[in-house]
Amino acid sequence: MAKIINIIGREIMDSRGNPTVEAEVHLEGGFMGMAAAPSGASTGSREALELRDGDKARYLGKGVLKAVEAVNGTIADALIGKDATAQAELDQIMIDLDGTENKAKFGANAILAVSLAAAKAAAAFKGVPLYAHIADLNGTPGVYSMPLPMMNIINGGEHADNSVDIQEFMIQPVGAANFREGLRMGAEVFHSLAKVLKADGHSTAVGDEGGFAPNLPSNASALAAIKVAVANAGYELGKDITLAMDCAASEFYDKEANIYDLKGEGKKFTSEEFNFFLQDLTKEYPIVSIEDGLDESDWDGFAHQTKLMGDKIQLVGDDLFVTNTKILKRGIDNGIANSILIKFNQIGSLTETLAAIKMAKDAGFTVVISHRSGETEDATIADLAVGTAAGQIKTGSLSRSDRVAKYNQLLRIEEQLGEKAPYKGLKEVKGQA
């Protein structure tokens, strides 16, 4: 038995200079797992609660000492003596102790940190890599794949202080033979883009996720700059590299007026008009994936969007589904979107995360594993992507060590697994196989 003998919680810093929760789970025999909770900037209203202290005199109210206290107190008391390999049992104990619908008592940041640390400790006890233990928990032992990365090379919206409304413009190295080559292609385009932006007199400062954050005249101009960068790097857009966008449309949706307000370019749209605006972009550029193309509450609009583009474009629900099986089931039943973004901390435990992945795959949805804009050096999502054979990962640009840490872990995993973890490129994207 992988008996838990101690649990330690602490307050550490994330990549935005805000506190977050880190947890250690110690087992008999000297085995240990450590994990940290990430934090989002553009968040869905139905996400599990990230518990903050609210003390304005300390970290501007963003301290997490209450969540840390829960880890070191109630959670530790309940889990010490339990088996770390019994992930579902551990997570359910924490969920039941919290007793709220959205983990508001302890905080999803507390529960998640312990949940992931327990999984890492269990993997250490078993003497296997974390991705292998996750595959076991997922009921798919030995089934792996290397994910196609969505690399966020131009940041806008809530992730940058600029005039670009759409939050993320991403490249996907679909023409690569393996993950390592895909990463190289992405890095080369990233550096090529820096030269393109500089030549046009734009800033090459980076946003929260490591992509550039230039003040561009329109959202389409971001795509145009990437097009030039891809060509200058020696690749063919649409063949070697495809494009993806995260609109994070809830951030520029005016609920009172019921319009989508692209203030950066002075344009306003109804729900239907914005769908056609996005469709026009997919006709002009090889965009194969659009995330959160409408406000999280605009289900009628999403139904229209799915009918309009769902057979050819991957439509990913992030704020729309918030890694929640109840909300995802509603989407599946009503023909809303065709893919889900998976973020641990939206739901707050590894077990619930795996349940969302399974539900999505069983319904024929694709799965994209994702970081948050507030990250740490913790690279657990790399193991999650491989261990669930998710197929796609979104973990920022080729800049900032909080992003690159995940890519480096994927390089190590590919080196270990070789042909046991195929890289399928464009075949992983809904509507493109």
Curated annotation (Swiss-Prot):
Disulfide bonds: none annotated. It is found in: Cytoplasm; Secreted; Cell surface. SMART domains: Enolase_C (SM01192), Enolase_N (SM01193). (2R)-2-phosphoglycerate binds at residues 167, 343, 372-373, 394. The active site is at 209 (proton donor), 343 (proton acceptor). It is an enzyme of class 4 (lyase). Its cofactor is Mg(2+). InterPro entries: Enolase (IPR000941), Enolase-like_C_sf (IPR036849), Enolase-like_N (IPR029017), Enolase_C (IPR020810), Enolase_CS (IPR020809), Enolase_N (IPR020811). The keyword Lyase applies. Pathway: Carbohydrate degradation; glycolysis; pyruvate from D-glyceraldehyde 3-phosphate: step 4/5. Mg(2+) binds at residues 246, 291, 318. GO terms for cellular component: cell surface; extracellular region; phosphopyruvate hydratase complex. Keywords: Cytoplasm, Glycolysis, Lyase, Magnesium, Metal-binding, Secreted. GO terms for biological process: glycolytic process. The keyword Nucleotidyltransferase does not apply. It catalyses: (2R)-2-phosphoglycerate = phosphoenolpyruvate + H2O. Its EC number is 4.2.1.11. Binds a second Mg(2+) ion via substrate during catalysis. GO terms for molecular function: magnesium ion binding; phosphopyruvate hydratase activity. Transmembrane segments: none annotated. NCBIfam families: eno. Catalyzes the reversible conversion of 2-phosphoglycerate (2-PG) into phosphoenolpyruvate (PEP). It is essential for the degradation of carbohydrates via glycolysis. Component of the RNA degradosome, a multiprotein complex involved in RNA processing and mRNA degradation. PANTHER family: ENOLASE (PTHR11902:SF1). Belongs to the enolase family. This is Enolase. It comes from Shewanella piezotolerans (strain WP3 / JCM 13877). The lineage of its organism: Bacteria, Pseudomonadati, Pseudomonadota, Gammaproteobacteria, Alteromonadales. The gene is eno.
